[in-house]
Regions:
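Nucleotide phosphate-binding site architecture
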Residues: 17, 43, 61, 81, ...
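Cyclic-nucleotide recognition modules
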Residues: 70-127, 134
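Solvent-exposed strand-loop boundary residues in beta-sheet-rich modules
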Residues: 66-68
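Regulatory nucleotide-sensing modules
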Residues: 7, 11-63
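Heptad-repeat alpha-helical coiled-coil signal-transmission segments
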Residues: 136, 140-143, 147-150
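Conserved nucleotide-binding and Mg2+-coordinating catalytic segments in signaling enzymes
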Residues: 150-170
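Short aromatic/basic micro-patch
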Residues: 35, 52, 73, 105, ...
Length: 170
């Protein structure tokens, strides 16, 4: 059944690691499933969000404003929506279904109740957030290196390899 498959997924999800089977069952009994078609958005930049979503089946892309390529693709067991749920700010990235996707939706009351009642869940959520920060640092470092490389290239004539007008002006 879907509940058995979802329980198995929760067992392998970093967010729910080491939660008791009873806690997982209670969580599932009050959660809802949301099905998305490819291209459908679960979260929209600028809108308010009061849920945390866990990918049960399929995958979603996290797409930042003004950037064509997805920032990250998340699959089974991974979560989205946690930042806007935790800080109450509008959503900072679109979350778009890549495939037919099923999401487990936990509303803010459930999430805050879990945080308050389970140090394990709170710790798991902190680990997920720390992983996201590390990933973003890596992306920023790579982007910064690439920008510096392009700046150097923009100061040299591609044909003659001599410094160009821009180099002289700076």
């Amino acid at each position: 059944t879907m509940t058995d498959r979802t329980l198995t997924l929760l067992d392998s999800s970093p967010l729910f690691a080491q939660l008791t089977p009873r806690m997982k069952r209670v969580l599932l009994s009050s959660a809802t499933m949301r099905r998305l078609v490819p291209g459908e958005r679960a979260l929209v930049i600028g809108e308010l969000n009061t849920s945390l979503f866990v990918v049960v089946e399929g995958a979603v892309d996290v797409v930042l404003p003004g950037i064509d390529a997805p920032h990250v693709r998340l699959g089974q067991g991974e979560c989205v929506g946690e930042l806007s749920l935790l800080d109450g700010q509008p959503v900072s990235a679109d979350v778009v279904a890549v495939d037919p996707t099923t999401l487990l939706e936990l509303d803010h009351v459930q999430v805050w109740s879990l945080i308050d009642s389970s140090a394990t869940f709170a710790r798991n959520l902190l680990r997920v957030l720390a992983g996201r920060v590390r990933h973003d640092h890596t992306v920023l470092a790579e982007t910064s290196d690439e920008r510096r490389r392009f700046e150097r290239l923009s100061m040299v004539d591609g044909l003659t390899t001599l410094h160009n007008r821009r180099w002289f002006d700076e």
